Amino acid sequence: MSDGGRIRCVRTLDWCEPLEVAAGLAMRDGAICLLSDPALPGSRSFVAADPEWAVTLDEAEGGPFAGLTERDLSAGLIGLASYDAGARVATGPRPAVWPDLMMARYSAMLVFDHDAGEVRVIGWGQDASAANAACDLGETWMTAATSPGAPPPPAPALIPDADDSAYLDAVGEVVARIRAGDLFQANIARGWTAVLDPQADPFDVFVRLAQGGAAPYGAFWRLGDRALVSNSPELFLTLDAASRRVVTRPIKGTRPRDPDPVQDAANAADLLASAKDRAENLMIVDLMRNDLSRVCEAGSVRVENLFAPETLPTVHHLVSTVSGRLALEHGVADLVLASFPPGSITGAPKHQAMKVIAAHEPPRGPWCGSLFLLDEDANLTASVLIRTASFERVEGRWHVRTQAGAGIVADSDPAQELAETEVKIGALRRALTG
């Protein structure tokens, strides 16, 4: 975990809103905006464009990171690992809908420190002259900042893959398998598609999501004829490069927000009191503990917090925190591979849950995969790609796919799980169609 053998340049600049800087770069290839809720302590956002290199890997033997070195996984890197890349060990080959791994490394990156109210431009190069030139490039991005405006709804409709009865039947079948002892929990999802209006762009969806309510792990990324928009609340992994401390924060348990404060508080209290949701959360905590134990120092993995309530603009969640210390013989790729795909969006046991998911869903693509950043100090932050839409440009039009799922356990009610998916897709539906 390093600067990849490069020299680093750092300059401090006056504040500018990251969404405005991203708007000035949005149409450039490799444009990336990682937008964090400024109300969260220590939150930082990142903007960059024009990567020095980008790679796309499909069905790599040995997993999505096979053949990559720690030098490849260095500061200034953005990557996207698709869910199917990690699930293939359980499901076997399935039709490819998205690359296993997309990565790009940037020679410059803007870091927006919301607490300090300042922007740092980081530049990397093989020598001081190249690093300073990269910083100069980053400064030009700031001068291109522009208001993102208020884009109109970019899609006429969001079309479900199947009617509600198909999902109700799938949940019923999974509940039966759980009661028969095949597994304990599985996350079963529904899918929707749309085609953007001819003049619309995925960045319009990102702007509408961001203006509708900030998320801890908001993201927009454009690479060629593909783009990703995410409004994820969930942390998959962080790794502090200096201390080697690892943290994961799985989410399990959801209730809708309500405009009536009394009902909203009642919904949150109901979630906290729910034995079903707490059991569901605990199963995933145990799974993540086991995953981290494969690459962390013996005895270092512990549960720091169980069933903490977290309130977002559209939902209440239960979040738990698990930490550990990465063993010296392991690096970033080992950590991600040991715990990917995230347990919160598979189920338990993970291998069996992924088989059950494949029996009821088409390939997921980037949804429920992970978007990850290695920042200026090569610290890893990886989100879980829920509340996420993927875009592919076909004959000049952007085609959209998104999903929403629910954790199914032995006492799940199919109608309630269906309603939960509607709550979870709500923000993306409004961003796409109004």
Say what each PLM segment does.
Residues M1-G434:
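Extended alpha-helical targeting/anchoring segments
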